[in-house]
């Protein structure tokens, strides 16, 4: 039931097609009695109207401008199944604790969208409408994607289960590190970082988002040194290792060339950045599927439209799009690290990545039930300002199916890179052992780490160096229905 309970004002018959301007709610974009079909795509928008603009008219305008409307009545509407194709705003609620903001629920007929195309989907729901003058701000908070639509996508090419089988690693989070500094190293020194980190016990190393092919290190040079390091580390440890080789480039032809070279060298994983765009992401997903390659996505650029609470696109929506588009890894927040990440909201992101079905959970920012129709699961990645002393918190908040990326927390270790990797691996193994023994690893976490450090100098050093490091700031994007406590 609408909190703003205004009846339908739709004008029908010959009056609907008189020349001139008609309000959106009279044109049929406000239908409070509409019951969404199982096949409808539903969007939840946070609408902030300009002062003096009726919130229902603003919500109806969002529905209209993201589907079939233009600024005036057009006679060609009579040549279409207008009643079917018009998006329908059927509910408008004030946002709790946010004066002047409203949640607008809008249903779209499935036939408005091309099968299996994120670019087409986004061209409608985040196209022109975000620049509409009657709105101060607009944010796409969540979407319900019907099974009929989900099934038109291929999803992640590898998935969590097959990735673990390929790596032969089960029962614990995977460990990684982003090579630092992200820019400036020569290929040889870059490869040395990779080798020491993997030999010390990490499962993966990673290129950062902006390392592509620069004067100080050509991409081919980096790939060669990285894969030499991976192969030597595998031989030394007897474990399957990998390094996320960033194939992001100026053109698809360049990206395919780099990905093919990574495959020739024996890499199990390639990496792309979110900024390459939705079509390029889906294209690389198709390549990864054909070539049995894990596809890692760095969410570079996402905060330009996910960070602000009243305008843009929520990261939970980006996560849904990326699961459809088909990536195996996606950076999804750390809770305790240096980057934005409310605990409950981040849990919602992780659930979207890893669950077969997401029930509505307002406390996690999830507004709709979502059936993933057997699409593979994505492995979330936690990266940014985390270290071994937080291991119990990371496992508590993020669970087991996650890649924990300790970049500075490995490479910044006072005893060196390999020691940093050892510290992280020992901390993880100690915490997983305590968990499997049934201990309260969260409350006992510091003691568990201290005991492990007594026989592991690298871990002892890590705990000493980073013992006071926290990033305890108020989150800017928290659930609207729950007050989220700060993370210690």
Curated annotation (Swiss-Prot):
Keyword Lyase: yes
Residues annotated to bind substrate: 128, 178, 182, 299, 331, 383
Matching InterPro entries: RuBisCO, RuBisCo_large_chain_AS, RuBisCO_lsu_C, RuBisCO_lsu_C_sf, RuBisCO_lsu_fd_N, RuBisCO_lsu_N_sf, RuBisCO_lsuI
Residues noted as binding Mg(2+) in the record, renumbered to the chain: 206, 208-209
Function: RuBisCO catalyzes two reactions: the carboxylation of D-ribulose 1,5-bisphosphate, the primary event in carbon dioxide fixation, as well as the oxidative fragmentation of the pentose substrate. Both reactions occur simultaneously and in competition at the same active site.
Species per Swiss-Prot/TrEMBL record: Nitrobacter hamburgensis (strain DSM 10229 / NCIMB 13809 / X14)
N6-carboxylysine sites (modified residues): 206
A GO biological-process term: reductive pentose-phosphate cycle
Family affiliation: Belongs to the RuBisCO large chain family. Type I subfamily.
Record-given protein name: Ribulose bisphosphate carboxylase large chain 1
Subunit field text: Heterohexadecamer of 8 large chains and 8 small chains.
Cofactor: Mg(2+)
Active site location: 180, 298
Cofactor note as given: Binds 1 Mg(2+) ion per subunit.
UniProt-listed Enzyme Commission number(s): 4.1.1.39
Source lineage: Bacteria, Pseudomonadati, Pseudomonadota, Alphaproteobacteria, Hyphomicrobiales
GO molecular function annotations of the record: magnesium ion binding; monooxygenase activity; ribulose-bisphosphate carboxylase activity
UniProt keywords, alphabetically: Calvin cycle, Carbon dioxide fixation, Lyase, Magnesium, Metal-binding, Monooxygenase, Oxidoreductase
More details: The basic functional RuBisCO is composed of a large chain homodimer in a 'head-to-tail' conformation. In form I RuBisCO this homodimer is arranged in a barrel-like tetramer with the small subunits forming a tetrameric 'cap' on each end of the 'barrel'.
Keyword Zinc: no
EC class: lyase
Site (described: Transition state stabilizer): 338
Known catalytic reactions: 2 (2R)-3-phosphoglycerate + 2 H(+) = D-ribulose 1,5-bisphosphate + CO2 + H2O; D-ribulose 1,5-bisphosphate + O2 = 2-phosphoglycolate + (2R)-3-phosphoglycerate + 2 H(+)
